[in-house]
Amino acid sequence: RVQTDMNYELTDVMSEYRPEHERMLYSLGLAGSAFKKVYFDPNLDRQVALYIPAEDMVVPYGASNLETAERVTHIMRKTKNDVTKLQDAGFYRNVELGEPVTFTTDIEEQKAKESGFSITDDNRYTLYEVHADLILDEIDQPERERPRGMGLARGEDRKEGEALQIALPYVVTIEQGTGTVLAVRRNWNPDDPLKLKRQHFVHYVYVPGFGFYGLGLIHIIGGYARAGTSIIRQLVD
């Protein structure tokens, strides 16, 4: 029954699943890392699974994986109409953002140059969706209940009246142009006593690298290709 339901979801309901997965596989071999985000879209009223390029996922230096990273930022781009619909649905705060501000990265500009096209004005908002462990006293109780296994070390006493400061997982969405916070949400299951963060991202790696991101064909054979080109030019000269 579960298999039948999942097949129905992926083939009939989630129409974007196959093309997004194929885009991810193509990018994976070149870049070495690719991501997919699985979440509930209020505009579509269903689950979606979208491909995310490696350059749109930002993690702290030294992070080893998504599960243990203290902060993961997804750079999103949404049209004004999409943001308005999410505000109307109560997913984002109903605040005035003005007109979208064009924002491009060095990677996007270089990719456009290599592909032979120019970047025109992009009438979309750039949003930073930050999945991070935060201490928000305005939302959480000052004296939090300690999850199982998170007590004080042996021989360590907490001062009387001192609040227990434990960062908990949240999702904070920020509009890049104005710096406006659109949403702050808890990112753990209410029934989870450990308050572990819910995982919305899947990281695919082509060849494991020395850090968080994997190595692709560009990294593996790129150096040999440049060396071969240099040798040929020297022989011709």
Model-assigned labels for residue ranges:
Residues R1-D237:
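Extended alpha-helical, oligomerization-prone segments that build pores/tubes and scaffolds
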